Amino acid sequence: MVMHFFLLFVSNILINNFILVRFLGLCPFMGISRTIDSAIGMGLATTCVIVFVSIISWLINFYILIPFHLIHLCTMTYMLIIAVSVQIFEIIVKKVSSTLYRLLGIYLPLITTNCSVLAIPLMNTKLNSNFIESVLYGFSSSLGFFLVLVIFSSIRERISESDVPMYFRGYPIALITASLLAIAFMGFDGLIKF
C-alpha cells in the first residue's frame, strides 16, 4: 500500500506533470514565471488551493453527490468550491503578506480559472479515488506544478540576462525553453512501470 502511494506521488510530480505532459495550467506558467519570487508565491498558493479543493471536493462528492445521485453536478460543484477556496485564500494572503499579494497581482484570482485546479477533482471522481489517494493526488500534482514553475522561472531569469536575438525575446524564447523542459521531463517516462 505504501508503495502504491509512493508511485502515485512520484508519477504525478515527474511523469504525469500537469504542465509539461497534460498541458494544463499554462496561463500562470507563462504569465507568472518571470521572477523566481512570484513563481514560488504562485506555486505555494496553487498548492494550498489544490490540496484544500481536493479535500472538500472529495467530501462533497462522497457524502452528497454520490448518495443523492447528483454526480452530474460535479463540475459545477467543483467550480463553486474552487471559487470559494480562492477567495478565502486571497483574503488570507492579503492579510499575511501584502508584498506577495501585490506580486501575484491578477494571477491570484486567476487560480479560479486555472484548468489544472478543476482537473484534479474531476480526475479524482473519474478514478474513483479514496480520500487518501485524492489528497495525495492533489498534493503531488500541485508539487509537480510548483516544481516546473520554479525551474522555468529560474531559467527565464537567466535568459533575461542573456543576449537573446531580437526576434526570440519574450514569449518565443520562453516557449522554446518550455518545450525543452518538457523534453527533459520525458526522460522520466520509463522510471515507473505499472
From Swiss-Prot:
Q: Does the keyword Protein transport apply?
A: no
* Major localisation: membrane
Record's GO cellular component terms: plasma membrane
Compartment(s) where it occurs, according to its Swiss-Prot or TrEMBL record: Cell inner membrane
InterPro entries documented for this protein: Ion_transpt_RnfA/RsxA (IPR011293), NqrDE/RnfAE (IPR003667), NqrDE/RnfAE_oxidrdctase (IPR050133)
Q: Which biological process annotations from GO are given for this protein? A: electron transport chain
What is this entry's stated membrane topology? Answer: Multi-pass membrane protein
Q: Which UniProt keywords apply?
A: Cell inner membrane, Cell membrane, Electron transport, Membrane, Translocase, Transmembrane, Transmembrane helix, Transport
EC no. given is: 7.-.-.-
Q: Which Pfam families match?
A: Rnf-Nqr (PF02508)
Transmembrane ranges?
1-21, 48-68, 73-93, 103-123, 135-155, 172-192
Q: Which PANTHER family match?
A: INTEGRAL MEMBRANE PROTEIN OF SOXR-REDUCING COMPLEX (PTHR30335), ION-TRANSLOCATING OXIDOREDUCTASE COMPLEX SUBUNIT A (PTHR30335:SF0)
Q: How does it assemble?
A: The complex is composed of six subunits: RnfA, RnfB, RnfC, RnfD, RnfE and RnfG.
Q: What does this protein do?
A: Part of a membrane-bound complex that couples electron transfer with translocation of ions across the membrane.
Per the record, the similarity remark reads:
Belongs to the NqrDE/RnfAE family.
Q: What is this protein called?
A: Ion-translocating oxidoreductase complex subunit A
Originating organism:
Buchnera aphidicola subsp. Baizongia pistaciae (strain Bp)
Gene label: rnfA
